[in-house]
Amino acid sequence: MAKKSLIYREKKRQKLEKKYHLIRRSLKKEISKIPSLSEKWKIHGKLQSLPRNSAPTRLHRRCFSTGRPRANYRDFGLSGHILREMVQACLLPGATRSSW
């Protein structure tokens, strides 16, 4: 189980990313449309004045049940060992263990 503080920090980053998503996207569109370099620098300064944790690259995918940051399956939102336990307990519909 991950520390609660790390899970809350990640949730805070997700909220910030949602809050500044439209602003960040509009500034990036402006940068691509404007040909002059001086105007691009001004808009780039506005982009850098946004909070650091509002950038989508700062987000990290975590397991829903344990908060584990590694070995996550996107389809389920679970880490590998929790996914294995749930499949063995038949808690995930349609998921079967492979055997050959």
Swiss-Prot record:
Cellular component terms per the entry's GO annotation: chloroplast; small ribosomal subunit
GO MF term list: rRNA binding; structural constituent of ribosome
Localization, UniProt: Plastid, Chloroplast
BP term (GO), one: translation
One family name in Pfam for this protein: Ribosomal_S14
Principal location class: plastid
Keyword Ribosomal protein: yes
Entry similarity comment: Belongs to the universal ribosomal protein uS14 family.
Function, in words: Binds 16S rRNA, required for the assembly of 30S particles.
PANTHER family from the UniProt entry: 30S RIBOSOMAL PROTEIN S14, SMALL RIBOSOMAL SUBUNIT PROTEIN US14M
Protein name, as recorded: Small ribosomal subunit protein uS14c
The organism's taxonomic lineage, starting at the top: Eukaryota, Viridiplantae, Streptophyta, Embryophyta, Tracheophyta
